[in-house]
Amino acid sequence: MIQYKEKEIYFIDYSNIKTSEEFLKTIKETGAFREKVKAMGKKDLLILVDITDSYLNIEILDELKKAGRIIKDISMKEAIVGITGYKRILLQIIQTFTNLHFNVFNTTEEAKNWLIKE
């Protein structure tokens, strides 16, 4: 969690991950927190995901779809940065399978400002 202008944002940092193994490990680590939040019945998280300069493949995509299903249950708003090139197509796939609608931003600052806006 990060604090931004007196609001809490659940920041998922997948940036600069260059291997499948490292990405899958990070998804698993962040998954424990998501499960805990879901068990508490929380449904109003502001979520920011950063995948800038990260490597993605089909295996990672499958795990992100699973994570996305939980995020859908615990979030109020979702933002993502680092979406370029083929990642736009992968994001569309994730959104289709999870019914999540991430808003895409160029910078984390833009994303954070959008998340905290009422």
Please tell me what each predicted stretch does.
Residues 1-118:
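Amphipathic, Lys/Arg-enriched alpha-helical "gate/interface" segment within cytosolic domains
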